[in-house]
Design a protein with these regions (language model features):
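Repeated loop/turn-to-beta-strand initiation elements of outer-membrane beta-barrel proteins
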Residues: 55-59, 85-92, 122-129, 159-168, ...
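Outer-membrane beta-barrel "beta-signal"
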Residues: 228-240
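Membrane-embedded beta-strands of outer-membrane beta-barrel proteins
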Residues: 47, 76-78, 114-116, 153-157, ...
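Short glycine/proline- and aromatic-enriched beta-strand/turn motifs that initiate or cap beta-hairpins
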Residues: 18-67
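Residue-level signature of outer-membrane beta-barrel architecture
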Residues: 51-53, 82-84, 116-122, 157-161, ...
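Transmembrane beta-barrel strands of outer-membrane/channel proteins
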Residues: 24-28, 60-64, 94-98, 131-137, ...
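Solvent-exposed loop/turn segments connecting transmembrane beta-strands
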Residues: 37-41, 65-73, 100-109, 139-150, ...
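Outer-membrane beta-barrel transmembrane domain signature
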Residues: 136-207, 213-218, 238-240
Length: 240
């Protein structure tokens, strides 16, 4: 596992060289929910890139959760879209989600996604949006996980306003998961996850803002029956 984790970090380093922006988040979740989220990360570094080309677009992000000594885990989502016609708003969407941690507890279940997307924007690209309907296949990734079929509905948005000084962006995901808690083992559930971000852009390169992770059935909580969580961050962003 250590060798795989080191290899994953090397791959992340390669992605860093091509990143469009880098974000540093300080997470308050563990302060808000000390019993339900005692091991939640405090600091996350996010690398992100979107790149359009004649065929469609590439998008990826990598989240690196940090400890005071080393990386704790790395999670990535990488997607490719192929336009269905030169002027068509529809596209075929292929995606991989997954990551690795320093142990199974902090690892992520891997998944492949395939489906369609409807994309749009206004004339100056200050407003962008996307809706994706996807088949999702989870893979057995570590102990107490198993392979199963699922679906995912995703919405993505971006809005720049106030003479380009403010940016509001984010996504919302809905997908079917199977519960791994002992008393609900294998039971289907609907997971909802959204992470809106607000940025004040001091310069075209430097921004200060916040991300708020709002979820239901997403956080693995063994303390009680709580399933709904709101985890805010304070963040810095640098656009290359």
């Amino acid at each position: 596992m250590k060798k795989i984790f080191v290899f994953a970090l090397m791959a992340v380093a390669a992605l860093t060289a091509n990143a469009q922006n880098i974000q540093l988040h300080y997470d308050f979740g563990r302060n808000i929910y000390p019993d339900q989220e005692p091991d939640r990360q405090k600091v996350t570094v996010t690398l992100e890139q979107f790149k359009a080309d004649p065929w469609g677009s590439w998008y990826y992000f990598v989240d690196l959760d940090l400890t005071n000594k080393f990386f704790r885990s790395a999670y990535t989502e990488i997607s490719r879209e192929f336009k269905l016609g030169k002027e068509s708003p529809f596209a075929a969407h292929i995606e991989y989600d997954g990551g690795l941690g320093r142990d199974d507890i902090r690892s992520f279940q891997h998944a492949a996604l395939l489906g369609g997307a409807y994309n749009g924007h206004n004339e100056d690209f200050s407003k962008t949006w996307s809706v994706q309907l996807l088949y999702k296949r989870f893979f057995k990734s570590y102990d107490y996980t198993w392979a199963y079929n699922s679906f995912q509905l995703t919405g993505v948005w971006g809005l720049t306003f106030a003479n380009k000084k403010c940016t509001f962006s984010g996504f919302i995901d809905f997908w079917r998961a199977e519960n791994s808690k002992p008393d609900r083992y294998g039971h289907g559930m609907l997971v909802i996850l959204t992470e809106p971000q607000f940025w004040y852009n001091f310069t075209p390169h430097f921004s200060v803002g916040s991300e708020v992770e709002i979820s239901n059935n997403f956080i693995y909580n063994t303390y009680d029956d709580k399933t709904f969580f709101v985890n805010p961050t304070v963040a810095l962003k640098w656009n290359f």
